[in-house]
Amino acid sequence: MCKRSAEAVVLFLISFLTKSCKAGDGTAVNAVTNICTEIHYLKQMEEELKLKQVQLGTAVETLADEHRQLNLAAARYRGSKKGAAYALLTAVTGVKAAKAATQRAEAVEAIESAQSEFAKKRRQLEALRHIYKASAPQVDGATKGTPTSALFSTENLKCSVDVTFAVATATECDEQTGPSLAIKPAAQQLQTQENYKGVPDNLFKPPKVTNDLISKGNSDSSMNTVSMAKACSESSGISGSNGIGINTATMKPLVETVGAEQLSNNGRCTEPTKTTQKEHHINRARTAGVLCQVRRHLTQPVDSVAIATVGSLVNDPDAQTAALLLDGQVTTEEDADKRQAAVTKLLGEASTNINTKFFGPLTIEDVALKIGSATTKTSIKKAAAGDLYAAALAHFTAEAEKRTEKATK
């Protein structure tokens, strides 16, 4: 019996529970309880989107390569049952390649938009953490002012004091606490997710500072000397009769809270928060709406034909129609058994492995192409992937034409 790591077991259970549950927020969303876990969630989604882009691109490239290989094979064996089988697979692969290209094209804008939004949101959260990690305020630069009636009807003392916050760097979230295992399946759970969880927009504001103000006396005339960094006073400093200043300034710590934002309402993705048609820069609703939009494109990429079996193609309408045409039957045939039989007649039994039977032989270097005075020996697989594709296709087409002419004489 194979052993599983603790992490693998936990991920398996999370995946199992996720598939067993109905629509709702999964473990990933529920694991977001503060700024750091929200950052972890956004990072996970960014990584998943990068992976999805690679998968969609790989599907297009793989199917395009398979289509070229099968097209060469169909040309080589044209006029035979083997040629008809390769022609059928060429048709099926062509349809799949077109679907894969469309799938990627439709997903590009949504994925790039989501990546931009998640990166922006993550930077905003990181900036908020750094702002609140500033070191203790420094009070200095006291400067005597002229009393007016700005605050009270009659003012006796006035002093301007600077409160400076030194720049500081917050501990990285990954150092503070690694990403939770519960967040890892974020992309898989997105399809049934109802909410995005994160800190509210109104949490993004400068720290609150409490100033400890102290005054002594009521005469401004004798406050002619600044002898203290924190206060304006008489020349005798702390023992003087008149003075005013700030003793301490204390920055209030950030109280981290998170809330839920619906991804959609009545089938429509959540709209960004706006004021007079202008989107707020800090916008949790926008992030929720972007998640709603991008999940429509996080579908399984179109599968390669090489990994299929004949059994996985017999119910494919495109494969059935192509098989009927190649077998000289009417494409309007509605009998399911006859449509399936047309496919198996050309490709073999349902258990037949497409890669082994049809792609395997294409790796054999049995193709001799005479280009100029030189003869190049290659395989269909190599020719399809390189600069010899056109030459190989022309060669096989010419050979097939010769066979046709010979047969008609």
Residue ranges and their predicted role:
Residues M1-K409:
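Long non-transmembrane domains of secretory-pathway and surface proteins
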